[in-house]
Amino acid sequence: MPSSSDAINRISYISLVTSDNDKFNQTFQFYSQLGFRLTKSFSKVSSYGSGLGANHPEFQLGVSHDSLKEVWLESYPLQNVDSNGNLRPWQEMEVYDGDNCERLNESTVIKVRLLGETPLKSISQKQFVFFTTQLNKIEKILTDANVKYGKVVDNVILAEDPLNNIISFSNTQNELCKTRFQSPEEYVEKTTAEILAKRKKSQLGSKFGSFEEISPSEVGGGNGLRKKKIGVMTSGGDAPGMNPAVRAVVRAGIYYGCDVYAVYEGYEGLVKGGDLLKKMEWSDVRSYMSLGGTSIGTARCKEFRERAGRLQGAYNMIKNGIDALVVCGGDGSLTGADLFRSEWPSLVKELVDTGKLTKEEVSPYEHLTIVGLVGSIDNDMSGTDVTIGAFSALERITEMVDYIGATAASHSRAFVVEVMGRHCGWLALLSGLATGADFVFIPERPPKAGLWKEQLKEVCLRHREYGRRKTTVIVAEGAIDDELNPITSEEVKQVLADLGLDTRNTILGHVQRGGTAVAFDRRLATLQGVEAVKAVLEMTPDTPSPMIGILKHKIVRIPLVDAVKQTKAVAEAISNKDFDKAMSLRDNSFYDDYRYFRDISIYDDGSKQLSEDKRLNIAIVHVGAASAGLNAATRAVALYSLSRGHKLYAVQDGFAGLVKGDLKNLTWMDVEGWHSLGGSEIGTNRSLPSQNIGKVAYNLQKFNIQGLLIVGGFEAFTSLHELSEQKANYPIFEIPMVVVPATVSNNVPGTEYSLGADTCLNQLVSYCDAVQQSASSTRRRVFVVEVQGGHSGYVASYCGLITGALATYTPESNINLRELQGDIDLLQKVFATDRGEDHNGTLIVRNEQASAVYSTQLIADILKENANKRFETRTAIPGHVQQGFTPSANDRVMAVKFSLKAMEFIETRNGCYGKHDRKFSDEEISEHSQVVIGIHGDVVKFTCIKHLYDNEANVALRKGKTVHWTDMIDVANILNGKSLLKKQERY
């Protein structure tokens, strides 16, 4: 007899080999009698001598290449039977909870093979151990087959198969199990009960729907510390981006080991309590990213303004164990939250004194933590460059004015558009820049009382004389003159009507709040929501309540009281007629935006023209792939040039056109309406100066070009480097040249932002939302979405964050099998308990150059192969749709800023400014004439092309060396569950 170490227990698969045809048939017959069922039969040579199996490859799947014959025998798992004795389907059994759930027991497959030559003989005899619940039936089968057998103990039968393998049968599952089963029914009943009990225990302590099974909350709670409970609420007017903020707070809170409660209906939910305070699970916020408004509701609550209301709010928070509050709202909501915190100790004391709560109940809640998120479409909060929802509202306004512009041009009408903003003119000013408005009225820079009507008439009439068929005037709802008299849209309408214009008045109203958040707001809200949770966990009772803001493109914490105080100071400055102070209290770029609007819309009357000797000939050329913002930048440069007296030449069809000498002098009407046009009206391609550098120099000299703007992506960057390197041979290349980055890939060294990237991301938001809706509607579907970006992972990382993708593959991350396996594990957990009711559709985002091996289709196939039928996969490739049709509002505004800043650089290098009028310091312009304009934080700066090319450019991969979007990758991994899965593996 073999030793116990030679025994093979709990067999799932075994291959038995012989070269004797009789023994092959005997072995097949032996195991068939024991209850194994034939599932596959293969023979290379049939009984008639024809090679049936050999001629049909589909019959050979899984068959060993050296087998003449094979039979596959399988013992199926034990299952329940119905009243007629028929097996019930596995999916109808009580223990079934998805195809990957634990089974009652595993099946066994025996492959019997016939070889043409004698196989190697085994050194030792092997023993196979089979589990059975019917030993008496096994004895009868062996007896009827005249097979000798014996018993070692009363519950183990030993026998030999025709190939002399020792097989044993036992009615215990393994050596550690003491239970001896006497019937299939007994085993099924007991095992079913054990599986259900184990599952119930697992679901009580951990359930992936809430991500508690991989949450590190046990780590924080296991050391005797009370688990932090955070409330999140939205208050005041709704704003796009509030839902992504709530999603971020909920999931980041769970990730950091906290319980998170949604306070429904704003402060009203805090006062009323009950069902309006709901503990949130991971899956509760699954679809929040693509929803506009706020799904947890908002309301203006009069009760909370009174101490009695705040007292009741404190009571409800303590009863639910909540001692931290993240409030997303405007300045009024955040002021109320900070007042609540300052009163908290006295409110707690009053609750004890009145007997509503005991000292023991309130002792863990002596201090309240408040963190503010600014959700406001007005962008009127000081201390932050932009508020959640502002860019979404700007996008809505821009879209509506574009629509209005179409009908206005058709009928040659004038439209007065009133936008929201209260005491803040940000929406009015930037929408004026983005839509090419003739005039804007904002409270921070009011016109002269008694004179503004004539000024308005003069500007609008002049533009009509230039050939414009429509007139657009944007009025902020808080617009005033310098004597604080309100300027209403009706008044403005009457002024235009007096000019004889067919005028209409449009108040956009709450349409500005509507719709889903744009890409920028989704990112802003998500990053700020995660930062809010970190602030809650890091604050002490002495820490002032912070407001989470964004300064220089970095998420920061600002004392809430200071921000509110400074915000109110703007209104006070306006009421005191100190308009310069009001302008200075706005974000850093507000004054520049106002200055640029005047340059291209008001000062085209010739009042700011330079003297004849300082007027320049400037050329602009588009290089590389089309990108949103090219035309908007060209329009801004053309209008600025006309207002300053310069000549602007548009190079047709890139550097190929410059080689031909195909340049056109642009007029005012040539660029009319270009602010809203995508693509390139003057033509663009990937041709470089090096194709005929001599001709490029000749035509620049021929047209006496004194400054060159190169608008485009990495080809524009390369073009400037080629021109700069040839300065010694062609002195004309000493003229100031500026690259204005414009590419969806955002891969130009020297800048963190390129024109067209925002439009691309907004396109991807719409595309991925639609794809995700399809995935959710069809249930259990995973889409692998391929996005552009070249070898830069910026677009993919941004897209993955703002669409809630489960995984993002970029060139920087290096896809490998280990990472794919981790994502497969995460997907399997996501779908493990899903029965189709959760609308559980999932996205994976892949950059087009993420891997030369793991293509989009291959990743989808690998996921599908490992899905075990729990989900299916599809691919989605938006392709050139990502370039967009109409530029986003943000791209239009940035096109004006970039291009006019570049023009000021060219003017400065050509000595157009006097000593006191210069726009740049000596350090900024230095000795370099060939530069790239870029954004670093919120600072626009110029960097020498030689420095960038030599030190910061990866020329081979056509991108910069700096990865400035790592924060998006880290936050995305927290919110998609990947970081949680890794923590589970560690703990």
From Swiss-Prot:
Keyword Coiled coil: no
EC number(s) stated in the UniProt entry for this protein: 2.7.1.11
N-terminal catalytic PFK domain 1, as annotated region: 1-602
GO MF, one example: AMP binding
Principal subcellular localisation of the protein: cytoplasm
Residue sites binding beta-D-fructose 6-phosphate 1 per the record: 376-378, 420-422, 477, 510-513
Positions contributing to beta-D-fructose 2,6-bisphosphate 2 binding: 781, 874
Name of one Pfam family that matches: Pfk_N
Keywords for this protein: Allosteric enzyme, ATP-binding, Cytoplasm, Glycolysis, Kinase, Magnesium, Metal-binding, Nucleotide-binding, Transferase
C-terminal regulatory PFK domain 2, as annotated region: 617-987
Binding-site list for beta-D-fructose 6-phosphate 2: 413, 504
Residues binding Mg(2+), per UniProt: 331
Interdomain linker: region residues: 603-616
Active site: 378 (proton acceptor)
Amino acids binding ATP: 237, 300-301, 330-333
Subcellular location: Cytoplasm
Requisite cofactors: Mg(2+)
Subunit structure: Heterooctamer of 4 alpha and 4 beta chains.
Function: Catalyzes the phosphorylation of D-fructose 6-phosphate to fructose 1,6-bisphosphate by ATP, the first committing step of glycolysis.
Protein name: ATP-dependent 6-phosphofructokinase subunit alpha
